[in-house]
Amino acid sequence: MPRPNFMAVTEFTFEGFSIFEWHHRLILFVIFLVLYVLTLASNAIILIVIRLNHQLHTPMYFFLSVLSISETYYTVAINPQMLSGLLSPQQTISIPGCAAQLFFYLTFGVNKCFLLTAMGYDHYVAICNPLQYSVIMGKKACIQLVSGSWNIGLSTAIIQVSSVFSLPFCDANLISHFFCDIRPIMKLACADTTIKEFITLLISLCVLVLPMVLIFISYVLIVTTILKIASAEGRRKAFATCASHLTVVIVHYGRTSFIYLKPKSQNSLQDRLISVTYTVITPLLNPVVYSLRNKEVKDALLRALGRKPLS
């Protein structure tokens, strides 16, 4: 008996924001393009400032520079496709191209989750064990933490992409999204996806809940230690050290958890609009938060511009 032809679909079409009128899409294009350029520029500035200022050659800023690199590639993997789709609705992408986009999206997205965890551990050691900080957070330890984050990101992406694209796609090829994400792609499969969805949920729990728990434990210990500091000024400085990281953590995990840990939604437009926050807005938020809330970064930036650092 001949096998059914499961290779009927050779490319996917993005629904994107085609539901909006042309003039609305044009406004969105301009807004998202500005945010995209600002994201690339601000992350590049963070990297340059850290590279040129030897006072910032510490573990905390090493992690921040790696985070900026990850955010840049993460943005490049998604935003150009979205911007192009705003100008030309019903844009197509080949199945290998879709698999590649999903691979890079997952690699850098998961990498970010564990980088934030490593940064939380760095803050914990700095505040709770300051006398041993230089020993614990040596160059080798920092490289191992970053390498571990990248390896987890790559492994997760390989597993997920292999799982999703082993499914047969027969007739439906319209992705109800503006980029290749797991759930919208699995909806198009002409086979039972129960096991694949369970794998996705299990991985989501591992890469979202586990880092959140580790960061939460770190901050419980950090806050406990800070409250034991005698001087109000000392407590203020300690809290200020963690404020930027904590802001980024809350925003990142709050939005991604809402998308990937909630039950399947029938409102694909709502999911797309929420996805905009972590593919367009959050990558810009990180360098802005670290620049505005971190005195060392602000002073280094002012020195690079030839201006006097803040007193």
UniProtKB/Swiss-Prot annotation:
Main location: membrane
GO biological process, one term: detection of chemical stimulus involved in sensory perception of smell
Membrane topology category: Multi-pass membrane protein
Gene3D superfamilies membership: Rhodopsin 7-helix transmembrane proteins
Membrane topology (Cytoplasmic): 51-57, 120-149, 224-237, 293-311
Disulphide bridges: 98-180
CDD domains documented for this protein: 7tmA_OR10A-like
Keyword field contains Cytoplasm: no
GO CC terms of this entry: membrane; plasma membrane
Residues that span the membrane, as ranges: 30-50, 58-78, 99-119, 150-170, 203-223, 238-254, 273-292
Known function: Odorant receptor.
Name of the molecule in the record: Olfactory receptor 10J4
Species the sequence originates in: Homo sapiens (Human)
Gene (name only): OR10J4
